[in-house]
């Protein structure tokens, strides 16, 4: 309760400082709209359906690209940890590509797929898959050796060993990798939606782009706040409960 009150007070102070900067004329309302202006935009966009439609389009793209990235990254990570040749090739490539900013994939996506939905999905997948590969590989390699020896002593080999020992033991690393992959996917999609203009549906990134084009800073900041809230809700509703479960079950994790 005390933590909630302190956090609420902190954000109220931030809003008060924001309001003061606008009212004191330190920043022009054109560059920094007041909290009231941003709130009015969000209410208007919610009432006419613009915000809901853009959010649903963005979340749908994110989920599709993210899960495809997991389906590709998880097996690749397992192969990387199991075979030396794959580690020296796919593993090195994954490590290098993870450091590449997601926005760098946009020119390739536009050249290969054009102004299409596939271009944005490609950028999201590229932002996700390499984090999952590295996290899976790291998770398998950080399993306590005693687990592997005990499994071998008890006759666990092959698929049984992987499904009953290796994967469960590496779950904390896998969840961390999926969480990181989600963050990279989210950023990748925002960059893609800002740069890729398509007619199949306008997402939150498009609202950011058009807000900038129209110098509507209330729209830009309002959409940014929506993006932040979605990210926080995803962490609290999806990843935090899983991390708490892993901590209680195995004594690992961050919480």
Q: Could you describe each region identified by the protein language model?
A:
Residues 24-67:
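Periplasmic/extracellular loop-to-transmembrane helix junction in inner-membrane transport proteins
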